[in-house]
Swiss-Prot record:
The lineage of its organism: Bacteria, Pseudomonadati, Pseudomonadota, Gammaproteobacteria, Alteromonadales. It comes from Idiomarina loihiensis (strain ATCC BAA-735 / DSM 15497 / L2-TR). NCBIfam families: rplP_bact. GO terms for molecular function: rRNA binding; structural constituent of ribosome; tRNA binding. One of its GO terms (cellular component) is cytosolic large ribosomal subunit. Residues 1-22 are annotated as: Disordered. The gene is rplP. Keywords: Ribonucleoprotein, Ribosomal protein, RNA-binding, rRNA-binding, tRNA-binding. InterPro entries: Ribosomal_uL16 (IPR047873), Ribosomal_uL16_bact-type (IPR000114), Ribosomal_uL16_CS (IPR020798), Ribosomal_uL16_dom (IPR016180), Ribosomal_uL16_sf (IPR036920). Binds 23S rRNA and is also seen to make contacts with the A and possibly P site tRNAs. Part of the 50S ribosomal subunit. This is Large ribosomal subunit protein uL16.
Length: 137
């Protein structure tokens, strides 16, 4: 599963997920993409589940790019532990997703196959997504 090799700080503030995606909002590498239309958090497990669903559907043909990386640690205190005594241990890693962010890209497959693969990947995610194609300018 994806997680940073090393970080400057072990734990981070909760923060707020606001605004629209300023970067990573265009299809850059492939021909087709899966774009978030809602905001939320995408865990490393969800990223991997989506990748597996797409890879299995296209039968390992074409190329898939993962455009998000889980770089935010989420902490959790153990069960039946009283409040206080510091922040809990890092439980898992998430990527914060804003509307407009391209999550996955695909190339080398027909559009119908890509659409179906992205639909299967979108079922694994906790927010709404849409299918996008590369715009040539």
């Amino acid at each position: 599963m994806l997680q940073p090799k090393r970080t400057k700080f072990r734990k981070v503030h909760t923060g707020r997920n606001r605004g629209l995606a300023q970067s990573g909002n265009k299809v850059s590498f492939g021909t087709f993409g899966l774009k978030a239309t809602d905001r939320g958090r995408m865990t490393a497990r969800q990223i991997e589940a989506g990748r597996r669903a797409m890879t299995r559907h296209v039968k390992r043909q074409g190329k898939i790019w993962i455009r998000v990386f889980p770089d935010k640690p989420i902490t959790k205190k153990p069960l039946e532990v009283r409040m206080g005594k510091g922040k809990g241990n890092v439980e898992y890693w998430v990527a914060q997703i804003q509307p407009g962010r391209v999550l996955y890209e695909m190339d080398g497959v027909p559009e119908e196959l890509a659409r179906e693969a992205f639909r299967l990947a979108a079922r694994k995610l906790p927010f709404k997504t849409t299918f996008v194609t590369r715009t040539v300018m």
